[in-house]
């Protein structure tokens, strides 16, 4: 990488980091309901602008569902996905400085905790096979406050080192752990042997 390109990348990373810090400082004064409403508006706005992403989503839905879903249903799924992504991002920024706010976003006790506790009692560790449904960042933090078992998420580090450091702190704030995807096999084995959970 040339010095000029390296400097450009560093400046871009710093600008991205500064933007996120500004958003956190601004959003922290709002209510959970307000964050949700703004997220919906941002999601709709992004949906209308992101032509290429919509095309990719449509191709994937055509492969997954074929003709079993109508054109209208597929468009609604794509639109809802954009809205959910925007809401999830803003909610994560909203709780960044105040992680206990997660309880305002998940008010009901999650189903299946009894099953998890039975698995932990067997002392063989737990694997979670999860999908990116809903706000998985919030759910991970919420799990850390449930006093069940330590949860390790397998992730790819962010390209921006400043945001990656911030994300690591955010994701581990309630006691969870993080494994990087490319070097996590031995760590996974150790976690399972320690009767912990891996997702």
Which residues does each PLM region occupy?
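Membrane-anchoring hydrophobic helices of lipid-metabolizing enzymes
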Residues: 2-130, 164-169, 175
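Active-site phosphate/pyrophosphate- and oxyanion-stabilizing loops and adjacent acidic/basic residues
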Residues: 24, 141, 186
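Conserved Motif II region of HX4D acyltransferases
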Residues: 61, 125-129, 188-199
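Short acidic active-site motifs
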Residues: 115, 183-188
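Catalytic core of membrane glycerolipid acyltransferases/transacylases, capturing the structured
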Residues: 122-182
């Amino acid at each position: 990488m040339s010095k000029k390109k390296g400097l450009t990348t560093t400046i871009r990373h710093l600008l991205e980091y500064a933007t996120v810090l500004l958003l956190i400082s601004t959003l922290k004064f709002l209510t959970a309901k307000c964050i949700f409403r703004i997220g919906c508006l941002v999601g709709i706005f992004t949906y209308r602008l992101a032509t290429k992403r919509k095309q990719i989503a449509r191709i994937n839905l055509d492969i997954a569902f074929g003709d079993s879903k109508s054109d209208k249903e597929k468009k609604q799924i794509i639109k809802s996905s954009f809205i959910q992504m925007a809401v999830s991002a803003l909610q994560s920024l909203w709780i960044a400085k105040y992680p206990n706010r997660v309880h305002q976003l998940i008010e009901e006790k999650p189903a299946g905790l009894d099953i998890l506790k039975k698995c932990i009692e067997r002392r063989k560790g737990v694997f979670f096979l999860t999908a990116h449904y809903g706000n998985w960042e919030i759910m991970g933090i919420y799990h850390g406050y449930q006093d069940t078992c330590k949860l390790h998420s397998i992730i790819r580090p962010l390209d921006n080192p400043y945001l990656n450091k911030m994300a690591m702190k955010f994701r581990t704030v309630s006691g969870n752990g993080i494994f990087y995807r490319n070097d996590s096999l031995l760590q996974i084995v150790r976690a399972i042997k320690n009767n912990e959970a891996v997702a």
